[in-house]
């Protein structure tokens, strides 16, 4: 009877659209995580944590953002930190990828339904080879996170001893690879995030490597693995690599130029340390959320540059957020094609479909609108500058996690807005809209005449 009940309970999910199922399961994971973080055992004080704070933390972890209301290292006990780390790993890889691990362990066959959800979650256009892709993702993730944890373990070992060094290595490796930005080092008086290690090349370059690898995307991994020569890679992979390289080194150059003599950021460092800190800032803005200096000390122009880099984010099908590198690339290519009076958008001797151009434009406009509205709300509700409110809003919507220091003082309404933004940012506005608002695609029976409108 009990088995029959659960079978009936799961029947609606078997006929549900993959996009809608992904949204609902992510919501369930967040609520479950919030419930666990509310438990007295989750906090160092042994007292229950308020539900809104727990919900904010669980959403930030599952959506791999990194914004926090309470310090992760000092507020949460080991149980709470383990819950946060599990939420980061599930959110970074996707619940279906994690579920496949159990399918493999139990030697169960992955059916068509599961393949459909996996394809939607990973941004794949094909169901064939999806199981093989998941296997490669799990193996690659374990190898990269393991290597990062090992390097950080040996770096932390002389400073913290075996137990803490092992935990710090594992936690920060997973957090960096998943582009989450959570850290548990604050109980060692580091001054917040990775500020203590601003001049440490081992920590800086290890974290940067993990962030970049996690932000490239699983599809790019596979393409690079099978085609070591750049010319043989797909147009998408080449576009991702080119845009990522330009943004990282271009952003680093801009930050170095703007902040070179700023005493609150790079001013007190040696020239080589300034370049490393500028490079780290450019990388971490790609939705990672670690910081090696106070973000509130950035100049106004630097904050504007940071806003743009946060908006762009990482690549599709990765652990990163933002509107994605290729989305911005397609919009810029479309603008260039229009300026040259071309009727189609072309790149590397290939033509980009008009629907892809329309989707990219729509997504970018939606993110800009939501960022502006959210910033206005935070500025009015919490009496903070519009500049800092915009920084916080973009950081939440693009799942970055960097803050100018206003997160812990936000009112309940602003916290809820950021929770919604983090949720939208991780799952994607398109995924949520298609999953819940779009009707089933039907053949258009009526074709209307075109009309001319003036633009520009």
What is each stretch, according to the model?
Residues 1-456:
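Membrane-proximal intracellular helices of multi-pass ion channels
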């Amino acid at each position: 009877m009990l088995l029959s009940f659960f079978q009936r309970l799961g029947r609606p999910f078997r006929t549900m659209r993959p996009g809608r199922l992904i949204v609902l399961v992510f919501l369930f994971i967040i609520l479950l995580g919030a419930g666990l973080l509310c438990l007295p055992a989750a906090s160092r004080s042994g007292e229950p944590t308020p539900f809104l704070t727990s919900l904010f933390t669980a959403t930030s972890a599952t959506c791999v953002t990194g914004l926090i209301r309470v310090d992760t290292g000092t507020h949460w006990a080991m149980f709470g930190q383990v819950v946060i780390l599990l939420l980061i790993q599930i959110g970074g890889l996707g619940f279906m990828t994690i579920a496949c691990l159990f399918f493999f362990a139990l030697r169960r066959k992955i059916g068509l339904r599961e393949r459909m959800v996996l394809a939607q979650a990973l941004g794949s256009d094909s169901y064939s080879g999806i199981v093989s892709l998941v296997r490669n993702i799990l193996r690659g993730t374990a190898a990269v996170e393991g290597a990062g944890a090992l390097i950080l373990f040996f770096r932390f070992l002389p400073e913290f001893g075996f137990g803490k060094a092992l935990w710090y290595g594992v936690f920060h490796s997973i957090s960096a690879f998943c582009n989450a930005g959570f850290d548990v080092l604050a109980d060692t008086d580091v001054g917040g995030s990775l500020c203590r290690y601003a001049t440490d090349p081992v920590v800086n370059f290890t974290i940067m490597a993990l962030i970049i690898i996690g932000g490239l995307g699983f599809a790019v991994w596979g393409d690079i693995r099978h085609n070591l020569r750049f010319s043989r890679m797909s147009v998408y992979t080449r576009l991702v690599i080119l845009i990522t390289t330009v943004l990282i080194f271009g952003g680093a150059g801009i930050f170095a130029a703007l902040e070179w003599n700023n005493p609150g950021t790079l001013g007190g460092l040696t020239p080589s340390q300034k370049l490393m800190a500028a490079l780290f800032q450019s990388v971490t803005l790609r939705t990672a959320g670690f910081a090696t200096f106070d973000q509130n000390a950035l100049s106004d122009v630097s904050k504007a540059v940071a806003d743009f880099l946060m908006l762009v984010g990482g690549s599709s099908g990765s652990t990163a957020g933002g509107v994605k590198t290729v989305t911005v690339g397609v919009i810029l290519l479309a603008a260039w094609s229009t300026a040259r009076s071309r009727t189609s958008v072309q790149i590397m001797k290939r033509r980009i479909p008009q629907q892809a151009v329309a989707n990219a434009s729509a997504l970018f406009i939606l993110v800009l609108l939501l960022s502006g509205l959210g910033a206005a709300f935070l500025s009015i509700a919490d009496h903070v500058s519009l500049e800092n409110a915009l920084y916080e809003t973009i950081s939440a919507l693009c799942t970055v996690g960097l803050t100018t220091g206003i997160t812990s003082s936000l009112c309940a309404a602003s916290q809820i807005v950021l929770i919604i933004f983090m949720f939208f940012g991780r799952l994607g506005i398109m995924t949520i809209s298609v999953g819940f608002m779009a009707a089933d695609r039907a053949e258009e029976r009526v074709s209307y005449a075109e009309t001319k409108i003036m633009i520009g």
